[in-house]
């Protein structure tokens, strides 16, 4: 096939006339030669034959045209020499150990205007252990393009990759052809008439021969009217025999049926025949008795169209019995019985929940460890089973049963027009994909290993956007947008007509340490390397396979310290790599090393070891990765970041002796796109499966390797992000995208034993010109899609990192935005996401396979699906961490918790020791298919959350600016037991384990020097019985410890320690505005003396200036008085408390943690007496310094009615029962309030308000005097018995009510704990129904019982895991 360029030239020659033709002929020939390098008249034909010892040197201006396949030792092209590959029908294969191009040498196959149309392969051969001296720069088995060298490889123009446009189902079902399925409501004999020439359904009809004999007559008429030669598929659904007369039975027998004559009641029956050819018939018939179990009659037959293409017709007539597991039942009082346990006893204990005759049984210990079970006796209703652990009968365990559902009919008719083949429907025109080409279809599930290869087949019937491929898919590959997220599988082309490949051995051999410990195949492939000063390099339409070596520097394509590769470097046209297929590689795909301005476009990288698209040392900038696809990226041995856990532990030669690997910290980072400098462009790229991460922006504090000194320290951490637009990441383990971490830029040493380039901590803060003293320049991430990533959709740490119009779905955690555990690294910056969508569990349920990590129930419909990590892993949309974070105009869809799986749209980082910024905020949040109970979750002790006792776990908080999350505009949401931010009017949200509060909040950082193992106790003076204990954020090995509580401003606090107070500490005022203050009393031993000063510390400039001193006063009131440069402290030696008033003196930017002048601090040096004891002054501080709890910022009014965006909502419930004393008078006060409507209690006893749990309306209210409670409690029993199920029941006491007696049993019926003991005051939120909601609450105290909380409406029981 000739190039289009040649056709154009020929056409011009034909159209020319006379002298003009003759005059232009030589010019046209010159154009051909320019565009098609093999047409140059200066070329000499060259056919060197096959000689492995022939060392070819093409120089001194020789210009050769390779016309046939050849085998040589090596080829060196230099000194103006040129080698061009002839483009003709013969497949040319050039085998050589290496090709070196330098000093004006050139190698050409095709050109940009005249693509190579034939087939040309370069095969690089040789082993690493052949005792051949490697080139000191290029090594072995290479194409090297050195100074002055030119490499031009231009293959056919073919589409590089596209997307599926229709979903592929496992086994190819529903792909092409015809699919028909029915159940109830489609009774009778179902007939399909199929055109045998085309394999298409011509007509179909249903004949209800159960209902009427006339339907039998119509069936006979219908069959008689079908022309001979047509295919008939006939089957019964449900029942078709009751009014089936002999005429119809005989008509079917005439067609070839042997069983229709004897069709009985509800018998499954399927039949396929060709009209007029009874011998072609296939038939299946089952006599079905009873209503339990499954039965199926299935037939299929293979046919051939007039075009010679095969199609398969199949039919099944079935009775199907679905099964499901019951919930788990606790069985802690197991009777000892020789004959086993009777299931009837369990059914009596759990009425309506266990079937009579289970199909299977499972048992576990109370901790979830599987136990053995055995059915020991079945006879009628006497069904028994036994449970064993280590050969002995179980004493206490959990058990569940597999029960069959009622049977249902099912009829299926399908025509598979692609027998052992599949039609792929694609987005783009794929006419350039030819029969014999190989494609790869990416996984759209969590496992990257669900990527599948297919070979293209001829297909006359395919449209321009379809191809037929051999075989059937094993996995589900999505080809559509699901729940608003584009999850279409990428489809990449792997084969090209120009191939560069390594010749490989059958198995691994050791050419470097440990290589055969990790790989059983040969990994010593070929490689292409471009050095500084090459003349030109343009590769397109090329396939690279079996390339790369597990040696540093030997990669499939490697630009090595080549400098600027675009116009800035004098390259015209600029260097590019495009339309390449790089697959089955042994070390990366493309490496950009110390090179800038390279265009990498339309490249497919598949099945590689180590990072695929790789930037190496840190100074690589202005490179553009446009429309590149990487998938199936596996770990390699080269760098710590390439290695998996096993490699990390075994390969320790590059570490210092004594190094103990920590794989998840030091290694485990292999990524599809590894960006060592943010100033590169990624546009329209897809990271479709890596063992770790899709896109990882990593930071080199200084350049590494041979690039040392190319920028100043910290440059890469401050350079603005290049374009990051319309990229996607899925099927990765750790994350779809990460911006975080750095690499260790020093060699291993006794001080730091980790290997060079291990993963370490780093922070990103983009500024103009990479100068932190210049304005910030946010990193903008637009139109990013992340789905089916097992851990994170994205983990982004900044600096200003802003996301806009992004999509996240089916990730373990959709998004974590982080700044710094102590301070934001770039104070004044924020992380932000807006106009984005988060989906918890989409309609992409994945494929249930043996190798699926996790398969379990979904949250909304409880149907099976693949899950990201574990069945009980708490799936989260956005995870709050550090701050400040702004979430604006985002939609959360399909987040639904199960009992045992705490899924939520908004949540917090698990096991968090670090700070939580009170200025983290949300606004204009929308929820779709998210129960209100699953909007937020603050955590509880248990799996994944552990004890929930780390400092950050206890101080989590965020600001709901418009009430779109909580229904309380302007409120703050906090953990329910964080009394440093609570006030008396806060409203509990039991489902969230949180509370809705109002107030003005900031943070106080307390740094205790020369002591890292102190436990701090901080108490807010208005809630002295609710201290907060903080362990400190830092490890015990540090020289100081830091505590970071969120506090309410304008309040008083005391601070205590579990050991002797620290002799030196600093208190930082964080997120304080000018004039904000708190009063603090710090516990010290008696006899302590103090030196206290204040200063301002500029963290950016690392400058500190003293601003004042504190002098002692003997009057507590003087602590309130302060003057510029002079403040007071009060040392109350009786209580052991040092009192200070901490007040911010300077203005603060909106998102800054510290003031514009720096961080305001108070430093305390204490001279402690010897042998001082524990510094806990709680007993002497309270009640002396207790303050009355008041609400400084009133609670916002709850949104109602049309203000709410969802049908489910919160019902505000307030109840109080208290005793108040005014001098010698006593007043009992009680009320119940529902959504602002108050029901006062008028007499001693109890008052009840009943609320419809479906709509939230009060349906009744009443009171029961003490006389009734004590004398005739049956009135209360009857009242409660008459309350409809699914009702919320509120109850409050007033006065001296009766606290004991039979009436209290109603509390237990409404969800209160058994054996409760009531005190003088009681408030109760109960529920009448078949389950106990988490929000059932009983408060009972001697003086005051109070409940302020919300209840979700409608009340819905969570499904069990």
From Swiss-Prot:
Protein's job: Mediates depolymerization of hyaluronic acid (HA) via the cell membrane-associated clathrin-coated pit endocytic pathway. Binds to hyaluronic acid. Hydrolyzes high molecular weight hyaluronic acid to produce an intermediate-sized product, a process that may occur through rapid vesicle endocytosis and recycling without intracytoplasmic accumulation or digestion in lysosomes. Involved in hyaluronan catabolism in the dermis of the skin and arthritic synovium. Positively regulates epithelial-mesenchymal transition (EMT), and hence tumor cell growth, invasion and cancer dissemination.
Domain G8: 44-166
Family, similarity comment: Belongs to the CEMIP family.
Gene name for this UniProt entry: Cemip
GO biological process: hyaluronan catabolic process; hyaluronan metabolic process; positive regulation of cell migration; positive regulation of peptidyl-threonine phosphorylation; positive regulation of protein kinase C activity; positive regulation of protein targeting to membrane; positive regulation of release of sequestered calcium ion into cytosol; sensory perception of sound
Keyword Iron: no
Keywords, sorted A to Z: Cell membrane, Coated pit, Cytoplasm, Endoplasmic reticulum, Glycoprotein, Glycosidase, Hyaluronic acid, Hydrolase, Lectin, Membrane, Nucleus, Repeat, Secreted, Signal
Main location group: nucleus
Subunit architecture: Interacts with EPHA2 and ITPR3. Interacts with HSPA5/BIP; the interaction induces calcium leakage from the endoplasmic reticulum and cell migration. Interacts with clathrin heavy chain/CLTC.
UniProt PbH1 repeat ranges: 572-594, 595-617, 719-741, 798-819
Source species: Mus musculus
Protein name per Swiss-Prot or TrEMBL: Cell migration-inducing and hyaluronan-binding protein
Secretion signal span: 1-30
GO cellular component: clathrin-coated endocytic vesicle; clathrin-coated pit; clathrin-coated vesicle membrane; cytoplasm; endoplasmic reticulum; extracellular region; fibrillar center; nuclear membrane
Tissue specificity remark: Expressed in Deiters' cells and various supporting cells in the organ of Corti including inner phalangeal, border, inner and outer pillar cells (at protein level). Weakly expressed in brain and testis. In ear, it is specifically expressed in inner ear. Expressed in Deiters' cells in the organ of Corti at P0 (postnatal day zero) before the onset of hearing, but disappears by day P7. Also expressed in fibrocytes of the spiral ligament and the spiral limbus through to P21, when the cochlea matures.
Maturation and modification: N-glycosylated; glycosylation is not necessary for HA-binding.
Lineage: Eukaryota, Metazoa, Chordata, Craniata, Vertebrata
Domain GG-type lectin: 176-317, 1227-1361
Catalytic activity: Random hydrolysis of (1->4)-linkages between N-acetyl-beta-D-glucosamine and D-glucuronate residues in hyaluronate
Superkingdom of source: Eukaryota
Gene Ontology terms, MF aspect: carbohydrate binding; clathrin heavy chain binding; ER retention sequence binding; hyaluronic acid binding; hyalurononglucosaminidase activity
InterPro entries for this protein: CEMIP/CEMIP2, CEMIP_beta-hel_dom, CEMIP_X, G8_domain, ILEI/PANDER_dom, Pectin_lyase_fold/virulence, TMEM2_PANDER-like, WxxW_domain
């Amino acid at each position: 096939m000739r190039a289009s360029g040649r056709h154009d030239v020929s056409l011009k020659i034909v159209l020319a006339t006379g002298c003009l033709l003759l005059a232009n002929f030589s010019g046209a020939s010159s154009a051909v030669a320019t565009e098609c390098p093999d047409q140059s008249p200066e070329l000499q034909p060259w056919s060197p034959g096959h000689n492995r010892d022939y060392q070819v040197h093409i120089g001194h201006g020789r210009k050769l045209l390779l016309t046939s396949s050849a085998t040589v030792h090596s080829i060196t092209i230099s000194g103006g020499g040129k080698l061009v590959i002839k483009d003709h029908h013969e497949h040319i294969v050039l085998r050589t150990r290496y090709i070196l191009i330098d000093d004006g040498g050139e190698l050409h196959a095709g050109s940009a205007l005249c693509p190579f149309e034939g087939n040309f392969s370069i095969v690089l051969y040789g082993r690493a252990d052949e005792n051949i001296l490697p080139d000191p720069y290029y090594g072995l088995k290479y194409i090297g393009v050195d100074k002055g060298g030119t490499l031009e490889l231009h293959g056919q123009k073919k589409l590089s990759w596209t997307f599926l446009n229709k979903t592929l189902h496992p086994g190819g079902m529903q792909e092409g052809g015809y699919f028909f399925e029915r159940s109830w409501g489609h009774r009778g004999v179902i007939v399909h008439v199929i055109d045998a020439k085309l394999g298409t359904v011509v007509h179909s009809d249903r004949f209800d021969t159960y209902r009427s004999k006339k339907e039998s007559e119509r069936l006979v008429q219908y069959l008689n009217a079908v022309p001979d030669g047509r295919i008939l598929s006939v089957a019964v659904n449900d029942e078709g025999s009751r009014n089936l007369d002999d005429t119809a039975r005989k008509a079917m027998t005439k067609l070839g049926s042997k069983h229709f004559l004897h069709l009985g009641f509800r018998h499954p029956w399927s039949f396929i025949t060709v009209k007029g050819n009874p011998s072609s018939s296939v038939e299946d018939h089952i006599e079905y008795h009873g209503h339990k179990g499954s039965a199926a009659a299935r037939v299929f037959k293979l046919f051939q169209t007039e075009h010679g293409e095969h199609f398969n017709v199949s039919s099944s007539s079935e009775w199907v019995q679905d099964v499901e597991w019951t919930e788990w039942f606790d069985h802690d009082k197991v009777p000892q019985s020789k004959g086993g346990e009777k299931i009837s006893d369990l059914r009596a204990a759990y009425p309506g929940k266990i079937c009579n005759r289970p199909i299977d049984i499972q048992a576990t210990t109370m901790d979830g460890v599987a136990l053995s079970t055995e059915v020991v006796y079945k006879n009628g209703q006497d069904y028994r089973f036994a449970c064993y652990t280590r050969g002995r009968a179980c004493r206490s365990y959990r058990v569940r049963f597999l029960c069959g559902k009622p049977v249902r009919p099912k009829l299926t008719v399908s025509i598979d027009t692609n027998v052992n083949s599949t039609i792929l429907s694609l987005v783009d025109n794929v006419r350039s994909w030819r029969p014999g080409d190989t494609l790869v279809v990416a996984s759209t599930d969590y496992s990257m290993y669900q990527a599948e290869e297919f070979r293209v087949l001829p297909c006359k019937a395919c449209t321009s956007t379809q191809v037929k491929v051999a075989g059937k898919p094993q996995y589900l590959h999505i080809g559509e947008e699901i729940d608003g997220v584009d999850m279409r599988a990428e489809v990449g082309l792997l084969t090209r007509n120009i191939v560069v490949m390594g010749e490989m051995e059958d198995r691994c051999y050791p050419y470097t340490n440990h290589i055969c410990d990790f790989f059983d195949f040969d990994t010593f492939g070929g490689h292409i390397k471009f050095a500084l000063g090459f003349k030109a390099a343009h590769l397109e339409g090329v396939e690279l396979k079996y390339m790369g070596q597990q040696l540093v520097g030997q990669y499939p394509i490697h630009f090595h310290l080549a400098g600027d590769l675009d116009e800035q470097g004098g390259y015209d046209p600029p260097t590019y790599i495009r339309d390449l297929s790089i697959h089955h590689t042994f070390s990366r795909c493309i490496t950009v090393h110390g090179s800038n301005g390279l265009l990498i476009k339309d490249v497919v990288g598949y099945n590689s070891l180590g990072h695929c698209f790789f930037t190496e040392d840190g100074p690589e900038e202005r490179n553009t990765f446009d429309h590149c696809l990487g998938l199936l990226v596996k770990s390699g041995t080269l760098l710590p970041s390439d290695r998996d856990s096993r490699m990390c532990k075994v390969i320790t030669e590059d570490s210092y002796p004594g190094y103990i690997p920590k794989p998840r910290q030091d290694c485990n980072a292999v990524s599809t796109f590894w960006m060592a400098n943010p100033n590169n462009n990624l546009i329209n790229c897809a990271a479709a499966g890596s063992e770790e991460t899709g896109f990882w922006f990593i930071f080199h504090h200084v350049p590494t390797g041979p690039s040392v000194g190319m920028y100043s320290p910290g440059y890469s951490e401050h350079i603005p992000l290049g374009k990051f637009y319309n990229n996607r990441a899925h099927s990765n383990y750790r994350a779809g995208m990460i911006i975080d971490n750095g690499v260790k830029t020093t060699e291993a040493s006794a001080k730091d034993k980790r290997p060079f380039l291990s993963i370490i901590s780093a922070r990103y803060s983009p500024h103009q010109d990479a100068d932190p003293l210049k304005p910030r320049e946010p990193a903008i991430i637009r139109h990013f899609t992340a789905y089916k990533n097992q851990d994170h959709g994205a983990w982004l740490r900044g600096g200003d990192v802003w996301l806009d119009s992004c999509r996240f779905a089916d990730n373990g955690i959709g998004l974590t935005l982080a700044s710094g555990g102590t301070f934001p690294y770039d104070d004044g910056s924020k992380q932000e996401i807006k106009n984005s969508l988060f989906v918890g569990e989409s309609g992409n349920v994945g494929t249930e396979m043996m190798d699926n990590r996790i398969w379990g129930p979904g949250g909304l419909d409880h149907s099976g699906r693949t899950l990201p990590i574990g069945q009980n892993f708490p799936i989260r949309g956005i995870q709050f961490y550090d701050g400040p974070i702004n979430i604006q105009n985002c939609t959360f869809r399909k987040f639904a918790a199960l009992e045992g799986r705490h899924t939520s749209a908004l949540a917090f980082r698990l096991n968090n020791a670090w700070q939580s910024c009170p200025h983290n905020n949300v606004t204009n949040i929308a929820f779709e298919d998210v129960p209100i109970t699953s909007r937020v979750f603050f955590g509880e002790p248990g799996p994944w959350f552990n004890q929930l006792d780390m400092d950050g776990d206890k101080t989590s908080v965020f600001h709901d600016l418009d009430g779109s999350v909580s229904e309380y505009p302007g409120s703050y949401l906090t953990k329910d037991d964080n009394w440093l931010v609570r006030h008396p009017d806060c409203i509990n949200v039991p489902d969230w384990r949180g509370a809705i509060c109002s107030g003005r909040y900031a943070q106080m950082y307390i740094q205790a020097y020369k002591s890292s193992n102190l436990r701090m106790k901080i108490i807010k003076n208005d809630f002295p019985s609710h201290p907060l204990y903080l362990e400190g954020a830092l490890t015990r090995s540090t020289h100081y410890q830091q505590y970071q509580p969120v506090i309410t401003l304008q309040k008083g606090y005391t601070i205590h320690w579990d050991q002797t107070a620290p002799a030196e500490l600093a208190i930082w005022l964080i997120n304080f505005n000018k004039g904000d203050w708190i009063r603090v009393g710090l516990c010290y031993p008696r006899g302590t003396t103090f030196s206290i000063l204040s200063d301002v510390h500029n963290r950016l400039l690392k400058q500190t200036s003293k601003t004042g001193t504190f002098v002692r006063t003997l009057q507590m009131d003087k602590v309130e008085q302060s003057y510029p440069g002079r403040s007071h402290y009060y040392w109350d030696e009786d209580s052991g408390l040092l009192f200070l008033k901490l007040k911010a003196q300077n203005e603060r930017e909106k998102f800054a943690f510290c003031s514009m002048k720096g961080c305001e601090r108070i430093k305390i040096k204490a001279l402690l007496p010897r042998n001082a004891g524990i510094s806990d002054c709680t007993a002497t501080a309270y009640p002396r310094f207790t303050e009355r709890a008041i609400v400084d910022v009133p609670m916002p009014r709850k949104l109602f009615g049309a203000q709410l965006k969802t049908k489910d909502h919160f019902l505000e419930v307030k109840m109080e029962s208290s005793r108040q004393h005014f001098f010698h008078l006593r007043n009992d006060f009680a009320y119940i309030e529902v959504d602002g409507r108050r029901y006062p209690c008028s007499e001693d006893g109890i008052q009840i308000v009943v609320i419809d749990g479906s709509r939230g309306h009060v349906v009744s209210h009443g009171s029961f005097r003490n006389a009734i409670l004590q004398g005739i409690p049956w009135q209360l029993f009857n009242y409660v018995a008459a309350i409809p199920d699914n009702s919320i029941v509120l109850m409050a006491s007033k006065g001296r009510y009766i606290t004991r007696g039979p009436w209290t049993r109603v509390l237990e019926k409404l969800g209160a704990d058994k054996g409760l003991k009531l005190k003088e005051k009681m408030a109760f939120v109960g529920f009448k129904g078949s389950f106990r909601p988490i929000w059932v609450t009983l408060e009972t105290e001697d003086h005051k019982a109070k409940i302020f909380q919300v209840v979700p409406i409608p009340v819905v029981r969570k499904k069990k895991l």
